[in-house]
Amino acid sequence: MMIRGHKLKIAEGDIPIAGVKSSRIYSDVSPFRKASDLMIHWNEFVFKVMPEDIAGDGFRLASIPVIPSSEVQAVLRKRESTNYVHWGALSISIDALFRKNAGVSGWCYVYDNRWETFEQAMLQKFRFNLDSGSATLVTSPNFPVSLDDPGLSNSISVAVMFENLNFKLESYPISVRVGNMCRFFDSFLSCVKNKVDSNFLLEAANADPLGAGAFGFEQDDQVSELFNYIQTVPTQAIKSREHEVPRGLFGMMGKKKVKSFEFASGSRNLGRRKPQRGRPLERSASLRVAPGFRSQDERVEHQGLSTDSDFENFLRKGKGKAGTESITSEGSSFDNISAREFQFARQDQKAKDGGSAEPPIKSGRRSESVPGRRRQTPSWKDRGNSGTDTGGHLREHSDTGDLGTNRVPGRAGGGEIHGGSEGGGVIQSEGGSRFDQNIQDYIFGPEYKQHDLPPSV
């Protein structure tokens, strides 16, 4: 349940999380106590995203970590008895590195990847518009996580998708900033003001929170199926720095320190090599590692790029032979696919092997389209509902014109989600054959079945 909390003004400048006052979250904050003594930390992660890291239509999901292991180790060195971290506030900022009113928009998910079901995992869902140059959402997750939890880096995950982002390769069109205010503690944190609610909205600018129904998902959909194949962007650490933000009037209350970690996409060093379906890019170890970060799988320091060919190789080898090479984002494994999907994949493997050739790649642009049609993105599809293409489905069901008074889409009937209702108007069930075809399209991509696309595409 999303609850609007204290209203605040989004900070001007380049650090939105700095505008979140710790006194709005914790009751024991006072001018006479330093934030460092209270173990309160502000961090910001800046990612420059290239078109290569965004699927053909601009639909690309990227899992973004929010806490470096080096930060945790520094806290443990200072106080060995520390056991938990409390997520006090989170800011998501998507900045356009191009002219205003260019018609670029998108969606953002904030979720806890440790959950099994979609409705329990989802923290925030919002649609953003970059016509004004930037979009920001500030929220309070308001829950603690054990520092020993192997899913610590997955407890807050951010996935971003873009629409109508028609940039040439080797340019940086988007900057994504993820800021967080967290507090480390030993055994029990009793000073949290809001003790009964998690995930309440603090402020939004050019971002409209949406109900789960707007994305065509159901409460019992499996997160392992919906997000297991989120393709992560390999990043390179550029630099880290520490900002000092004045507190109080004229800085009379001291300065707030905000650590900033800046990253760039590892794709920028790949030259003009363009990823093609069925041909994974070979990335050096330096491009796959972000120093200071640790994924859920301890053997992988940072997630690499998940390609469709990896999935196809897994299908050829079989589930029992996938091995460690199938590890993808944040410790996920291809072994987690459902038995239903695996059955469909195996049945259609022969048809795929005898299918049509790969489409040509245009100069300066990646092409995954069907001639004469608007390009559809096969990189990720909703596998929890029948007859659903994520690219077209999100465009169809995320209409901000159908928002209620609290900016949540209103639906007739169904359960209440975030103050709004969702019903049958969102998900349109279709026949089994349509479902089979969409499973095939998800697994192998429409270029393998260019003349056998479902009518909805």
Swiss-Prot record:
GO BP terms in the entry: proteolysis; symbiont-mediated suppression of host innate immune response; transport of virus in host, cell to cell
Skewed-composition ranges (Basic and acidic residues): 448-457
Annotated GO MF terms: serine-type endopeptidase activity
Keyword Transport recorded: yes
Disordered: annotated segments: 265-284, 293-312, 345-457
Signal peptide feature range: none
Keywords: Host-virus interaction, Inhibition of host innate immune response by virus, Suppressor of RNA silencing, Transport, Viral immunoevasion, Viral movement protein
Skewed-composition ranges (Gly residues): 411-426
The keyword Transport appears for this protein: yes
Family according to the record: Belongs to the tobamoviruses movement protein family.
Known role: Suppressor of viral-induced RNA silencing.
Protein name: Putative movement protein
Annotated organism of origin: Apple chlorotic leaf spot virus (isolate apple)
Organism lineage string: Viruses, Riboviria, Orthornavirae, Kitrinoviricota, Alsuviricetes
